[in-house]
Amino acid sequence: MTEILAIDLATTTGYARGRVGDDAPMFGTVSFQGKDQNQVFAKALQWMMEMVRESPPQIVVIESMLPPQAMLNKTSRQVRDRLAGLHGVIRGCARRWGVGEISECGVGEVRKHFTGFRNMQRDNAKRAVMDQCKALGWNVRNDNEGDACAIWSYSASLIDPKQALRVSPLFNKGLRVTGW
């Protein structure tokens, strides 16, 4: 089956890796903190090489950057430039080490798939994603891991639509609300 590496990319990055059809991905968090942009990019490059050099997945999926107007007055140009640089580092390394498909997915589509809601307020959406992960038995430690697991689930569902049934209360009894 197809193996996916899903990445919620930022200076603190969440990742999830697994095959389509797996019960759960392997997931974690990595920090690329550094004294300057160059050190941040070097740490990201080293991490990605370790993730793909010996056994590259068939697909790497990265959460898309938001359009500049979405973050107007909420972030600095330096932060946006860093995120764009991280995207370049991850994409270049993945291609160099033989990953066949490198793609992006929008946060709205991922959240709609994983929680049923596309336009929740950011903090509520992150909490809903973590709650869904825990309901699935994926013991994520933070929202970075949760978002990466949601990206992995979304991507697996695009390859095999039956995978989408796992995150739907209609088809997964463990996710149903019982206290009405």
Regions found by a protein language model. Name each.
Residues 1-180:
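Phosphate- and other anionic-substrate recognition elements at nucleic-acid/protein interfaces
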